[in-house]
Amino acid sequence: YPDGFDGEAV
């Protein structure tokens, strides 16, 4: 996922 829930891209 993009930046939104943790701050990193997965």
Swiss-Prot record:
Keywords: Decarboxylase, GTP-binding, Lyase, Manganese, Metal-binding, Nucleotide-binding. It catalyses: oxaloacetate + GTP = phosphoenolpyruvate + GDP + CO2. The keyword GTP-binding applies. Its EC number is 4.1.1.32. The keyword Metal-binding applies. Its cofactor is Mn(2+). Binds 1 Mn(2+) ion per subunit. GO terms for molecular function: GTP binding; metal ion binding; phosphoenolpyruvate carboxykinase (GTP) activity. It comes from the Eukaryota. It is an enzyme of class 4 (lyase). Catalyzes the conversion of oxaloacetate (OAA) to phosphoenolpyruvate (PEP), the rate-limiting step in the metabolic pathway that produces glucose from lactate and other precursors derived from the citric acid cycle. Monomer. Belongs to the phosphoenolpyruvate carboxykinase [GTP] family. This is Putative phosphoenolpyruvate carboxykinase [GTP].
